[in-house]
Amino acid sequence: MRVDEEPEFLTVENPWLYNERNVSCIPKGVYNIRPHKSPRYGLVLAVDDVPNRSHILIHAGNTAADTKGCILVGERFGNVKDMRAVMQSRFALNRLLSMITEPCQMEISYGYDHG
């Protein structure tokens, strides 16, 4: 993940599964993001206007098993229970939240092009 064109964070998402809710990564595109208080995860970033999806968040977690279609951020890659993971996720999320305090836009530019 880049902030102001500079590499800042590593991410983990589920693979492309045809934008199926709760299991697929989100499609390429430009999305509005904003700080959001989640009952489950606390202060996170909400990703708005994802086609046919809702409640997409950028939150802390380590592996794709920790997400249901959301984006996880971390400081470095590692392994958890033999799965690829991002590490220092809470630290990375807090750092990201300190950079993004107002609504802004995020572009997903790598991954599956849904058409």
Range-by-range predicted roles:
Residues 1-104, 110-115:
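Cell wall/extracellular polymer interaction/catalysis modules
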